[in-house]
Amino acid sequence: GGLEDTETLGVLARTHKDLGLGARDPALRSKHLEAAFRLYERAYASSRQRGAAGGAYYTGINAATVAVLRGELDEARWIAAEVADVCHAAVDVAADPAIEYWRRATLGEAALILGDAPAAARHYAAAMALAQGRYGDLSTTRRQSRLLAQHLPVDDEWLDEALSIPPVLVFTGHMVDQVGRAASRFPAALEGAVQPAIRAAIAAMRPLASYGSAACGADILCLEAVRELGGETHVVLPFPAEEFRRTSVEIAAGDWGARFDRLLEHADSVTITSDHRASGSAAPFEYANLVLTGLGRLRAQVLDTALRGLAVWDRGSGGESGGSASV
């Protein structure tokens, strides 16, 4: 019946595995890990019997991983060697890159369990080349490899580099000075010097995604640089775009308005944190700053990668509420 298909057995096994890893009581941990192993083992045997290679190496490598977690290294290595054979027999030069990614990642995990670090590194490198920006898949593989390394007699220092995921960027910075501003912070004449400095800083990080606002000046320069370098741009505005454009973009001379429009049109997401502007209050800006930093932090945590910050501001300025210094 439905309870015997590979996918259902895999979900049940994953649930027991997670419960086991989260259990503080050793007896409860052992109980859940044993249940996970039996379910993965059953699904693996069923997939092999049906000749379903994909299901076989998915459930098989998970059975081997749970065996490692249970301290059954001989059994883990026996299963891992068998899974590696299944993967090698399943080579398909016309395979979808996503399918081939998991075959290669599985070979990497099998090699790790078998104690063959050079082979693991080769397979992980091949998987990385096939990932094509699917950072969720990469983070899953990275977590699994770290989990294995914690329970195996292997040197794991190379794993983070072998399965590296670009960082997430949160940026902030001053707006270009409004005409007639008494205390200058970002004179329009400095754009030509600031722009390449921002691009160089972002190019050194190569973020997969960025989170920030879109005011004239540093925000727009950061968004343009990230987009030019191929990263995602996620814009967070404190109130609707039309009003934000009027109050935080068009205040400076130049083509900031047109650049703002282009960036919002091509942004991966635009989040509006309030449906109106509270005139005279910094609260909408403070809240938007909390949201954009929170979104960046959450994305970094989900992908198990670093969170980086970039600020373009005058350290000598007071740092008004809701301004650059508050991020």
Where are these regions (language model features)?
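Short coil/turn linkers that connect adjacent helices within long alpha-helical scaffolds
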Residues: 49-52, 91-95, 134-136
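Eukaryotic RNA-binding helical-repeat scaffolds
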Residues: 118, 155, 162-170
